[in-house]
Amino acid sequence: MKFEWDPEKNRLNEVKHQIDFESARALWDDPDRIEIEAPYPLENRYVSIGRIDNKLWTAIYTIRKGSIRIISVRRSRKQEARLYEKEKVREKQ
């Protein structure tokens, strides 16, 4: 998988959410990661929820020229964590 991002957005994300996009790539290694389409008027965007070091993170990204372009990453909200756990249980049944 190829990743890309805006360097300034990466810097700001690390300051605001204490995670840089390079580290956030590990989110895609979670076998239980879930994907949700996120409506956005200018391009197709997606939400990915998964674990990095046993903590839940949420990434917003798009696909550009075959690469995953990370837009932002933050700790998952309660609603996102519930959705992740619900999907994880459902997949294992």
Q: Which residues does each PLM region occupy?
A:
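Ribonuclease/tRNase effector modules and their secretory precursors
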Residues: M1-Q93
